[in-house]
């Protein structure tokens, strides 16, 4: 499992999600607004909006917040957000891809560059690291939907490419273009997914020691703390021994 997924699991176990709930809702709302603005405000006619709402519901975002975010898209004074991707290197030469939705490119670029620099990394040009990642669909389910065999069978039938199952749940990988079709097929067997989204999946991972892992996790944490940053992906790998120490 790539470093960022491991990091998410650590943060979940430490209960950090509760302290960043408001910021998470803000990011989910921004994605809903952008999705509604770039397509139809009806989720039945707009796949991106449908998935944005589904992901928000999976995080227990209140219905009123979701409806307000959709309505905001049609407001005359609603902000125009640009989708921007930043790429760079963290400690140890680890590749990092950052996705943002911003109403001020200069502000966001300056903030992201500063975070990389303070972590001992460097912000690069667009395309400087994304070539070592694949754009794929990621569909996640909670562990209670079934055992690994059941989920694997459903995933193969739906046309997915890979499945990772653990005590934390099931992660299903599929082609980016097939994400909507695969998620609908899985929903018919396993029910509604916890999340469905496009991600940058590393083609290969870089093993890091405990010191580097801590530095990289701090880098990711600081990037995700920025209001404009929506997602962060990286290609580092942490051993089970180090993971256990960081999870303690």
Curated annotation (Swiss-Prot):
Subcellular location: Cytoplasm
GO molecular-function term, one example from the UniProt record: DNA binding
Gene3D superfamilies registered for this protein in UniProt: 1.10.10.200, 3.30.70.980
Region (Disordered): 1-21
Keyword annotations: Cytoplasm, DNA-binding, Transcription, Transcription regulation
Major location (coarse): cytoplasm
Gene Ontology terms: cellular component: cytosol
GO biological process, one term: regulation of DNA-templated transcription
Keyword hit for DNA-binding: yes
InterPro entries assigned to the protein according to its UniProt record, in alphabetical order: Integrase-like_N, TACO1_YebC-like_2nd/3rd_dom, TACO1_YebC_N, Transcrip_reg_TACO1-like, Transcrip_reg_TACO1-like_dom3, YebC-like
Family of this protein: Belongs to the TACO1 family.
Protein's name in the database: Probable transcriptional regulatory protein Atu3727
Organism in which the protein naturally occurs: Agrobacterium fabrum (strain C58 / ATCC 33970) (Agrobacterium tumefaciens (strain C58))
Organism ancestry: Bacteria, Pseudomonadati, Pseudomonadota, Alphaproteobacteria, Hyphomicrobiales
